């Protein structure tokens, strides 16, 4: 085994796998350090990928030739497009996954990645010199040199599990925590915080009364995450839906003092949008019930994940809770739910590349940055892995901004605003969500991936073919036109203004779809259904996209005004509050400054004017020197 790598990635979860694979795709010699190869790709909490906002991230990871989309397609056992009744911008692909199939597919993908080696062991310390990371030391004493290191430790940094009145050190159930790395961070001056997350009990599906619960099928046919997946071939299953009852709530209220969150045992903050069942009852006491999704964990595994009742109440209380829920009265508990606390780094310690400001060559991704969720972790891992290679090799950084994708929105939120609770992606966080749709992730990002060199030959060829077909189909739809009188003969009611309208124009009407225009122009039948969907969505959003393009151009103008070397004490007109905030956060651009709390439009105007004055001075200085 070699003892030196271009990039070392610590942690084999969702962030670590994407980071390691991305680095290796760029040709870097890469090592993935994990406790055991068998735990690579493990789904620590819910057996599902995607969802609202999260599904966008999976599609964006796929567009950059990442792994998660293809692995989810291989392991998915129920696919649903959430928000299907709403517009395409807020629809979210989601898949229920077979835990074993998902992990096996991820492990196979890691094995097949050229330039990537796996080292089994516990990373115990970071090695550095002259303000730059130089490698790592394992708990067994082995040392490995690296040009860059990516840390993706999930909940393992000083992880502490809580179950009722009991607590014990662990990274997740039955796995040891990572203690040495926390000490390394503290020695380097990083301020560590504590966050909390939780998981529900696991149930024996053979003891559930499935006849007493509502059943929810998936989409037919299922829609894959990856553009490279022609069709889903794994057998599909149904999930169940039940609800808590007033009796459930009474059990929880009677025992809430035994919950670590309410006994004072846990002081850290949990995810607002994924609260424990005891938190739901305390915060929403007027509700008569809370929905629970019964999600099978595998095709040949009877274990069921009851999504919606995350808890750290004592095991006997969890059993009592289950007896009050329709369909679960006689269910057997496979494993109790629990809460886990872990260390995280303030993400404002990071550059938009996810490199730390304190130590060059050190990158962080996933829950260590204060996020929650597999998809958020995967997207960060991919960005960190790409930039680790570029930093180690002296290349230009790969920065994704808020107009590029949800991954850019997330990273900008983290490094600009920081977090005070685990960060979860939602479509509402994106200003340009009409542009940043799940259906066009490859159209937005694959060309950028090709320029970076992280997209392989198969995807590159597929992308070129698809984009050519899309351009041809759109041109065809724009070339075919009809008058209002002609349209009326086909059953379409248009404004009788004498204006000819193209097939593309007609598709912008809410009530007109591809089938209607194809009935008028049979030549449109030659367009594949997959391409037709894109043309129709583009037509529906055409007017709005033109407006949003102007907004994006204004955003990018502000992002182009760099603030990196400004002495804010020399900027006249800034309030002391604004000056202090700008000095503390050191935003890279005027646009980023505007996203800081407490920075007013007036302060931004002062900064922009100052930059213009300084820009006018520089040419005069050069001329004088000559």
Curated annotation (Swiss-Prot):
Its cofactor is FAD. It is found in: Cytoplasm. GO terms for biological process: tRNA methylation; tRNA wobble uridine modification. It comes from the Bacteria. Keywords: Cytoplasm, FAD, Flavoprotein, NAD, tRNA processing. GO terms for molecular function: flavin adenine dinucleotide binding. FAD binds at residues 11-16. Homodimer. Heterotetramer of two MnmE and two MnmG subunits. Belongs to the MnmG family. GO terms for cellular component: cytosol. NAD(+) binds at residues 270-284. Its main location: cytoplasm. The keyword Flavoprotein applies. This is tRNA uridine 5-carboxymethylaminomethyl modification enzyme MnmG. InterPro entries: FAD/NAD-bd_sf (IPR036188), GIDA_C_N (IPR049312), MnmG (IPR004416), MnmG-rel (IPR002218), MnmG-rel_CS (IPR020595), MnmG_C (IPR026904), MnmG_C_subdom (IPR047001), MnmG_C_subdom_sf (IPR044920).
């Amino acid at each position: 085994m070699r003892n030196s790598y271009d990039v070392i990635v610590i942690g084999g979860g969702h962030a670590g796998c994407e980071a390691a694979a991305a680095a290796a795709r760029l040709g870097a010699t890469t090592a993935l350090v994990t406790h055991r190869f068998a735990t690579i790709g493990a789904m620590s909490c819910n057996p599902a990928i995607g969802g609202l906002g999260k599904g966008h991230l999976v599609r964006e990871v796929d567009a950059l030739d990442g792994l998660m989309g293809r692995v989810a397609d291989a392991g998915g056992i129920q696919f649903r497009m959430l928000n299907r009744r709403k517009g395409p911008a807020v629809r979210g692909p989601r898949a229920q996954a077979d835990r074993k199939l998902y992990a096996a597919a991820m492990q196979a993908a890691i094995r097949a990645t050229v330039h990537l080696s796996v080292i089994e062991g516990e990373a115990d310390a970071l090695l550095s010199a002259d303000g730059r990371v130089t490698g790592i030391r394992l708990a067994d004493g082995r040392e490995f040199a690296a040009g860059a290191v990516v840390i993706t430790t999930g909940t393992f940094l000083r992880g502490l599990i809580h179950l009722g009145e009991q607590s014990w050190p662990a990274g997740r159930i039955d796995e040891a925590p990572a203690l040495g790395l926390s000490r390394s961070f503290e020695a380097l001056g990083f301020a560590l915080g504590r966050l909390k997350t939780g998981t529900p009990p696991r149930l024996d599906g053979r003891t559930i009364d499935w006849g007493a619960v509502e059943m929810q099928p998936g989409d037919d046919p299922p829609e894959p995450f990856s553009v490279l997946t022609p069709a889903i071939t794994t057998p599909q299953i149904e999930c169940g839906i039940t609800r808590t009852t007033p009796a459930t709530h009474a059990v929880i209220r009677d025992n809430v003092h035994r919950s670590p969150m309410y006994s004072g045992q846990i002081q850290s903050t949990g995810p607002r949008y994924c609260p424990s069942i005891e938190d739901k009852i305390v915060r929403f006491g007027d509700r008569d019930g809370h929905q629970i999704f019964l999600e099978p964990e595998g095709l040949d595994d009877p274990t069921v994940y009851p999504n919606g009742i995350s808890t750290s109440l004592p095991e006997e209380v969890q059993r009592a809770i289950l007896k009050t829920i329709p369909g679960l009265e006689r269910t057997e508990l496979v494993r109790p739910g629990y809460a886990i606390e872990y260390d995280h780094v303030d993400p404002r310690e990071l550059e938009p590349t996810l490199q730390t400001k304190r130590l060059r060559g050190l990158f962080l991704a996933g829950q260590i940055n204060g996020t929650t969720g597999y998809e958020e972790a995967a997207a960060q891992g991919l960005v960190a892995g790409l930039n680790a290679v570029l930093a180690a090799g002296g290349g230009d950084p790969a920065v994704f901004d808020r107009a590029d994708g949800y991954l850019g929105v997330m990273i900008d939120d983290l490094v600009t605003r920081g977090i005070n609770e685990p960060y979860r992606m939602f479509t509402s966080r994106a200003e340009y969500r009409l542009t940043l749709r799940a259906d066009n992730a490859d159209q937005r990002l694959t060309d950028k991936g090709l320029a970076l060199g992280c997209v392989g030959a198969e995807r590159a060829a597929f992308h070129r073919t698809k984009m050519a077909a899309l351009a041809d189909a759109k041109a065809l739809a724009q070339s075919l036109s009809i008058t209002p009188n002609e349209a009326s003969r086909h059953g379409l009611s248009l404004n009788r203004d004498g204006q000819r309208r193209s097939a593309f124009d007609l598709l912008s009407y809410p009530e007109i779809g591809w089938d209607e225009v194809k009935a008028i122009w049979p030549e449109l039948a030659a367009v594949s259904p997959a391409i037709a969907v894109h043309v129709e969505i583009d037509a529906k959003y055409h007017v709005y996209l033109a407006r949003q393009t102007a907004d994006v151009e204004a955003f990018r103008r502000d992002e182009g005004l760099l603030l990196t070397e400004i002495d804010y004490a020399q900027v006249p007109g800034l309030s002391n509050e604004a000056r202090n905030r700008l000095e503390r956060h050191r935003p890279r651009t005027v646009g980023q400054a505007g996203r800081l709390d407490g920075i007013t439009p007036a302060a931004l105007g002062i900064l922009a004017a100052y930059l213009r004055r300084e820009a006018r001075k520089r040419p005069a200085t050069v001329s004088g020197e000559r």
